[in-house]
Amino acid sequence: MSNYIGAIDQGTTSTRFIVFDHGGRIVSVAQKEHEQIFPQPGWVEHDANEIWRRTREVIAEALEKRALSASDLAAIGITNQRETTVVWDRLSGEPVYNALVWQDTRTAAAVAELARDGGADRFRAQTGLPLATYFSALKIGWILDNVPAVRARAEAGDILFGNIDTFLLWNLTGGLHLTDCTNASRTHLMNLQTLDWDDELLAAFRIPRAMLPRIVSSSEVYGNATLASVAGVPIAGILGDQQAALVGQTCFHAGEAKNTYGTGCFLLMNTGTKPTPSKHGMLTTVAYRFATQPAVYALEGSVAITGALVQWVRDNFGLIEKSSDIEVLARTVKDNGGVYFVPAFSGLYAPYWKDNARGVIAGLTRYTNKGHLARAVLEATAFQTREVVEAMEKDSAIALETLRTDGGMVSNDLLMQFQSDILDRPVVRPAVQETTALGAAYAAGLAVGFFQDTDDLRSRWSVDHTWKPQMEPERRQELYSFWKKAVTRSFDWL
C-alpha cells in the first residue's frame, strides 16, 4: 500500500500541495501565490488558468522535495476557496472570463432586485443562505449576461460552470465534471434536503442546468489523475475549505465546533444529519458527506475582521512593527483599561449582518496607553467569537463543550487564554495546524481505505495545547456587557 496521501489546498491567495503520512503528519509541502486582480472597486478576480498552473507546480515541487512519485500516493484530496466561480468552454477547457472571487461584490444590484420579492431570506428555506453577493449563483449569471454569446452557448450545453474544486478536478482527470455537496451548498442553487440542483432556484437565478456539475459526496473515488506527475492516483476527496477544517479537526459529533482564526473568523458547528435553520444570523450548510452515508450539516458564523485588525493597527496605525508584536505589547498591561475596539470597517457579519455599521474605539480615557489598545484589538476577536457561539447554541439547542481552533492567530497564547475565559469553555489547539489540507487528506484517505473510519481519524488527532477558563464569572460578565454596549455604538453609522 502507498504510504502517503496528498492534499491540494487551493486558497484565496495561494495554492499548496501537502503530503501527509498515516499519522496525519506533514511529510512535504509546496506553496505558490497567484495574482489578485481588481479591475474596478468591489471587483475581485483570479486567473483560473494561473491557479491550475500553480497547482501543477506545487504538486511537482512537493513530490520532488522528498523524492516521491505517483506510486507513493494512495489518493489525493482537494480543498478550495468556496463560492469562487469559473465558467469555461466544454471542448477547449478555456475559461470564458476570469474567476469571480467570493469577495467580489459586483452583483449587489442583482441581490437587491431579487430581494424585492421575499426579502434577503427569500431562498433560505431551500438553501440555508441569505441573498448575498458572496455566493456563486449571481456570479454565474453575471458572466452569462456580460460575456458575449456565453448564455446561448451555456443553454446549448457548450459551456460549463464549477467552483475551483470542479475546475481543478476537470483538469486533473481529463474532463470529469463533478462537485461535492459542501461546495454545491455554497452556490445558492442546491437544495439542502435533496442535495441536488433545485429547479425553482435555477429558474429564479436563470442558470441552465446543462452547465452544472453533478453533485457527489465528499469522499469517494471520482476518477484517476491524468496529470503526468500524479498519473493514475485516485482523486478521492473534495471539501470546501471551512468544511475541510471541520473534518481536519475531527468534529464528527453534533455540537463539536472549530473556529478558524485568519483575516476573519469562520466558526462551524456540526449539527448532525438534519439541517438546522437559523433565526440568529447563522448560515446553514453541508458539513460533509462520506460516500453513501447521510449528509452531515453545520451552522456557520463568519466574522469579517479579526486578524485583519492586527494588520490594520500595524500598517495604518503604526502601533506595532510586525503582527506578532501585538501579543508582546498587550502583555505590558494587565487588562484592557476599559477600552473596546469594534472592527466594523465594512459593516458587521454574524450575528448582526449590519452593512451600515462602522468601526468604533470606545472607553478611551487619559489613562489609556498602547498596551490597552493592543489588548482591545485581540479581545475583539474573542468577543465576536462568543457572539457567534451564543447564536449557534440558540439555533441548535446544543451547548458547546470545547472549541477547537486553527489558523494563523492560534499561535497567540494571550488571545487563546482570553478566548477560553470569555467563552467559559476550554479552547484547544491541535498538534497539526494545517487542518484544512488535513481534512481533504482525511476525506480522500477514507475513500481508498488509507484510513478506516471516523473513529480511526479521531484516534490520530492530537492536542498541542488546551486553555481552560481562569476568569471569575462576575468579571467575564462585566467585560462582555461593555463589549455589547460598544457594539451598539457602531450600528447605523451610515
UniProtKB/Swiss-Prot annotation:
Q: Where does sn-glycerol 3-phosphate bind?
A: 12, 82-83, 134, 241
Tell me its EC number(s), please: 2.7.1.30
Biological process GO annotation list? glycerol catabolic process; glycerol metabolic process; glycerol-3-phosphate metabolic process
Where is glycerol bound in this sequence?
82-83, 134, 241-242
Any one Gene Ontology cellular component term annotated for this protein: cytosol
**Activity regulation here?**
Inhibited by fructose 1,6-bisphosphate (FBP).
The residues that the entry says bind ATP are 12-14, 263, 307, 311, 408
InterPro entries in the cross-refs? ATPase_NBD, Carb_kinase_FGGY, Carb_kinase_FGGY_CS, FGGY_C, FGGY_N, Glycerol_kin
Query: What keywords were assigned to this record?
Result: ATP-binding, Glycerol metabolism, Kinase, Nucleotide-binding, Transferase
- Pathway annotation from the record: Polyol metabolism; glycerol degradation via glycerol kinase pathway; sn-glycerol 3-phosphate from glycerol: step 1/1
Pfam families noted in UniProt: FGGY_C, FGGY_N
Catalytic activity from the UniProt record: glycerol + ATP = sn-glycerol 3-phosphate + ADP + H(+)
Which GO molecular-function terms appear in the entry? ATP binding; glycerol kinase activity
Is the keyword Transcription in the record? no
Q: Where does ADP bind?
A: 12, 16, 263, 307, 408, 412
What the entry lists under HAMAP family is as follows: Glycerol_kin
Check the record and name the NCBIfam families matching this protein. glycerol_kin, PRK00047.1
What role does this protein play?
Key enzyme in the regulation of glycerol uptake and metabolism. Catalyzes the phosphorylation of glycerol to yield sn-glycerol 3-phosphate.
User: What family does this belong to?
Assistant: Belongs to the FGGY kinase family.
Q: What is this protein called?
A: Glycerol kinase
The UniProt gene name for this protein comes to glpK
